[in-house]
Amino acid sequence: MAKQLSFSNESREALEKGVNFVANAVKVTIGPKAKNVVIDRKFGSPDIVSDGSTVAKEIEIENPISNLGAKLIEQVASKTKESAGDGTTTATILTQKMVQEGLKNIASGASPIELKKGMEVGLDFVLEKLSSKSISLSGSDIQKVATVSAGGDEEIGSIISKAMDIVTSDGVINVEESQSLDTELDITEGMSFDRGYSSPYFVTDQERQICELENPKILITDQKISTLVDLVPILEEIQKSGSPFLILAEDIEGEALTTLVLNKNSGVLNVASVRAPLFGERRKAALEDIAILTGAKLISEDKSMTLDKVSINDLGKAKKITITKDKTTIIAFEDTKDLVKARVEKLKREVDMTDSEYDQDKINERIAKLAGGVALIKVGAATETEMKYKKLRIEDSLNATKAAIEEGVVPGGGQTLIEISDDLLNLSQTSSDDLRTGINIIKEALLEPTKQIAKNAGFNGDVVIAEIKRLNKGFNANSGKYEDLKNSGILDPTKVIRLALQDSVSIAAMLLTTEVAIADIPEPEPAAPGGPSGDPMGGMGGMGMPGMGGMGMPGMGGMGMPGMGGMGMPGMGGMGMPGMM
């Protein structure tokens, strides 16, 4: 494909247009008086969102060079979302201001490399100050942070606070849609562990990049699976039952993984696989815990058990399993509650019997995972559009609250950034010209979140900042008053601000030091089928279907192994393997 090239100031200006295009759409979503963004969908009703990352992902610009700028700032939002779970709009606003100020100075003759160095020096100073201002989160502050992060919705803040209180900060809290009008909190059996799907091709929700299995059967084994020969009998039973299927094994690789992906994507099996957590003996112990939670039998080599002898009765089950790229959450049925309780009591006895502090800690971690359960926040609303909106709000609020527990909080509303901005003045005065300019870019950017919060609430941002400095108080955009934001419970998670700053400086500095931009030249739209007349029947010849190996017809033994030319196992119709005809 032919490429379009853009150089020097021309390329940077085009990239800036893309940055502004996205940032101007995103920044209306910050603060308690934030506005919403409505997004058209080809199928179904439109989405109404107030999440910066979601808005940024939807934007495509016709100019290919400007679109690169749009994608760069979208990367800021998505990276901050991935790392902190919140703060995407703040990161976007910071990036836009840094890019705008940086390009002004480059046009005036400043060195992009020196600006970058100055920005990095300024960032290090800001992060050090931010850490020193951070305070630990406890008690009622948890509800305050959750409420602020939910746009001032006290109901959401209360529900998240209750969930945190019940399952603790290490517990599992899931958000799902409800059939009722009310948003409710439900505590159920379950656990999570730090392992994600073996392949992204198992994802069932492309937008959220997660795999969800409803009422699945679960195979749990401490063996490594590289070929599916031994699993053919149980896969046949699963296919007949129509149940979703999860394989939890020491590892699943090679031909076995390829075959599962093939059958998943062809609709033959609703399947996913996950590697077992931990290592060595602790891995086996963790698998035993999961087996008890799900009512499964652990297929172990130590017990001389082989995969080819597995029956449907050896499998576990769950209400729901949610798998991300690095985490798996199991929501169990209540019928294993007594077994889980007995397992927890056994583990407590093991803690009393060991003198090793390390072993005690590890066993206590297992107890916490088994006994903690899963908190389900069931989101209710009158319409599907409202439900999606509330669900996003709750997820952002939950992530922000977890971040606040991790690294503490600072007074919100941008007040802390304004205070640090003033501190940067002394640093910039002792630096060389271009280095000082880079530091000043950070200084100016730190004021921008407060300006936008004020603007969204109908106030003049410059006036608000001047009053904050004069009164030495924060601005409550909800009430329009200047007050002690810590006492008012308007708090921002330190982790969210830290990551927003780091991500914004990273992308802004890269963009400012860009000299050449290369993008594909869009190809013209192909002519409509059937030629100029638009005859819908034109060009329909050649409806052969080569390359469809692996989709054997029912009863034809379609589950043949690679290279067997369609010679499948008897009765295994429809489940194709690589290399089949």
From Swiss-Prot:
Reactions accelerated catalytically: ATP + H2O + a folded polypeptide = ADP + phosphate + an unfolded polypeptide
Cellular component GO terms held in the UniProt record: cytoplasm
Key words, A-Z: ATP-binding, Chaperone, Cytoplasm, Isomerase, Nucleotide-binding
Keyword Transferase among UniProt keywords: no
CDD domains: GroEL (cd03344)
EC number, UniProt record: 5.6.1.7
Subcellular location, principal: cytoplasm
InterPro entries: Chaperonin_Cpn60_CS, Cpn60/GroEL, Cpn60/GroEL/TCP-1, GroEL-like_apical_dom_sf, GROEL-like_equatorial_sf, TCP-1-like_intermed_sf
Ribonucleoprotein listed as a keyword: no
Bias-annotated ranges (Gly residues): 531-543
Enzyme type, top EC level: isomerase
Subcellular location: Cytoplasm
Chain intervals for the UniProt region annotation (Disordered): 522-543
Biological role stated in the UniProt entry: Together with its co-chaperonin GroES, plays an essential role in assisting protein folding. The GroEL-GroES system forms a nano-cage that allows encapsulation of the non-native substrate proteins and provides a physical environment optimized to promote and accelerate protein folding.
Family to which the UniProt record says this protein belongs: Belongs to the chaperonin (HSP60) family.
Protein name stated in the entry: Chaperonin GroEL 1
